[in-house]
Amino acid sequence: MERHEKKTLSKQEKRSFIKRIGSRMVKRKVSINVCNADLFLTKIMSNTLNRTSNSTEEIKTPLSLEIFKKEYDKFQPGECSQKPFGIIKSYAYNTYHGLIKEENEDKYLIVPHIKKPTNGNVRTWPKMSLFGIFDGHGGESCANYLKDNFLSCLLEDKNFPVDIKLSLQGTLERLETDFHKKFNSDEKNPRDVSGSCALIALIVDNKIYLANIGDSRAILSLENGTKYRPITIDHKPNNPKEYERIIKAGGKVYIDNDDPIRDINKVIIINNEKEFDAHLKDPEVVYRIYPCDLAVSGTIGGVKAKSKELNAVPGCISSNCEIFVFDNNNSNDFIIMGCDGIYDCLSNKDLVDTAWFAVNKLGKEKKYDINKVSLDMCNMIIKNSMDKLSADNLTVIIIGLDGLEKYLHNKINKEKIGNMIKENSKE
């Protein structure tokens, strides 16, 4: 298995992992691999990681491999494109249940070419591609529903493809309504309490549209990785705008203090902006919304977090999407779409650096094939997330653009010139 060099985990990284296990899964009653979690925690607490606390000897095997070798062995490479389409020079994707969870509630949607419906009334049909990540919680039903129905709902939207922003907004609103009607029309006795975040990339000719509900994220690498920028904004209670919206709706935001009873009287309530700003500087703080206990403030579905009949505060959890639009240009390298399991342990910079590490480290042996290189980027991001002990499902999509294609072409040309010089010097 191709791996990059990594350092031994710091104490802060270990504490962060323990906190993520405790606050995000065990207490949420999510199905986890208890053996892995217990083994890890036991080794941490008993300090039996092949060295004493005073020893300077490095662990020979990376900690995540030592504890979770079986999970690494199960990891399978994802899939990638075979040819370009429109402005998309390549794409690749992969998803994995991760080190701790037994089930993968993440779903993805890949439609390289949206074909014109036979009954379509639009004369000119643009080149369009669709990519989506649906990060489920409380079960797989909602994420599966979005995956299975998003494209058909989009094609049926009255504004599509004339007004893309309205089409994306209308599609997500319809999916929220339809899922609720199908599974939870009787709010007192819901048949399915699952919910899902939604991150959509729709490429239309030379324009790129990103629609987001929840805490999955898309970032753009620019100018051969020397720059990057987040495209979407996370819908979480640590977002000041989301915090303000939740409070206005009548909800509360609190800091998860690892209290398994979830007694609202024993947690730290954030009462004002001053307290909010003070805690925001602590990377270990996990914000949650009371009374639904979610750490994300935007989802499709999730009736228990939205229905007054089930003691929720309506309006705290939103199903409204944000849409971001930009034109493609030669400086755009690629888009990375990822679920929160990736971003919980890798910063935006970490993510871009990992992707470019794969390009430069593994590209040569793949003969700088943009499709295979894009897949290496996906796989390495997931492996790096496991190295950082992400405790969640892991899903990544890479969309290669002009900048990446040109960079790889330059690599190929330099290699050809280098080989020619070597041959001439022999003569």
Regions found by a protein language model. Give the residues of each.
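PP2C/PPM-type serine/threonine phosphatase catalytic domain
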Residues: 1-427
